[in-house]
Amino acid sequence: MINTSIPLVDLHRHLDGNVRVNTIWELGHQHGIALPADSLETLAPFVQIQGKETSLVAFLKKLDWMVAVLADLDAVKRIAYENVADAALSGLDYAELRFSPYYMAMNHKLPIEGVVEAVIDGVKAGLKDYQVNINLIGIMSRSFGQPACTQELEGLLAHKQHLVAMDLAGDELGFPGELFNEHFKRVRDAGLAITAHAGEAAGSQSMWQAIQELGATRIGHGVNAIHDPKLMEYLAKHRIGIESCPTSNLHTSTVSSYAEHPFRTFMDAGVLIGLNTDDPGVSAIDIKHEYRIAKFELGLSDAELAQVQRNGVEMAFLSESERKALYAAKA
């Protein structure tokens, strides 16, 4: 099912959406934070999906617990380290870990730039102990508004040499992408690549805006592109990567069933699309789970799954020499 001669990658993976249940438990007790359960076993349903959640709101409530325990920068460093460990232990050759420093900082009023530094330090420590390739993507969380995103951007750009790209995440209906055109001009001027969550809660126009105005060369989720034939044609022609996260889309009710997921439609249209975990800690999944879903629920053949693996490597924010090195390591 997974082709061992092709690098296995996960490009849409939120660092702040992958905090271990036992880490939430330990940090909560260490810092005197009231948790919603009185044992490790009973905590899991509050922070991980049990079956299918009914809405994005229910999903996000679980996600919020993952940052609620980030009481100091050591906690941030710990979860960054554990993210590297989890990526390696799940069999990934390469992962891009994205994180929103404002979201991670807000509960305990941590310094935004300090959060960025702690993430970088935690990842560096993890890379010393685990055999995996990792790059970082900074997120601007638009749900908190333009001024918050400016703070977030400045904290991230202060360490731009440790980032490969910037992302726009959050409420795309309430905070459309055009509110952040100036933010992304600064991102482009800094020489970073751009991806954006779009076409998930909003329609295809959100994706057009992300590509044409923000400068996105990849789109997170993008499920609503299938309703716009011109956009589908554009995506295929210009090799705009779709970071697809089928299980997450089901858990947030972006799609009502795997049968309704548009992954196959993208494949048949020749769109560059890859499989990703999104918030693996919340969904309680790993990348191999997504490949099983793609085979047994979405109906992809082993040859098509191999193409999806290759797509992921092509979409990755890597230089050609780095891409070749990933393949060489599998030879």
Swiss-Prot record:
It holds the Pfam family A_deaminase. GO terms for cellular component: cytosol. GO terms for biological process: adenosine catabolic process; hypoxanthine salvage; inosine biosynthetic process; nucleotide metabolic process; purine ribonucleoside monophosphate biosynthetic process. Keywords: Hydrolase, Metal-binding, Nucleotide metabolism, Zinc. Zn(2+) binds at residues 12, 14, 197, 278. The active site is at 200 (proton donor). Substrate binds at residues 14, 16, 170, 279. It comes from the Bacteria. Binds 1 zinc ion per subunit. Its cofactor is Zn(2+). One of its GO terms (molecular function) is zinc ion binding. It catalyses: adenosine + H2O + H(+) = inosine + NH4(+); 2'-deoxyadenosine + H2O + H(+) = 2'-deoxyinosine + NH4(+). Gene3D superfamilies: Metal-dependent hydrolases. The record marks 221 as: Important for catalytic activity. Its EC number is 3.5.4.4. Belongs to the metallo-dependent hydrolases superfamily. Adenosine and AMP deaminases family. Adenosine deaminase subfamily. PANTHER family: ADENOSINE DEAMINASE. Catalyzes the hydrolytic deamination of adenosine and 2-deoxyadenosine. HAMAP family: A_deaminase. This is Adenosine deaminase.
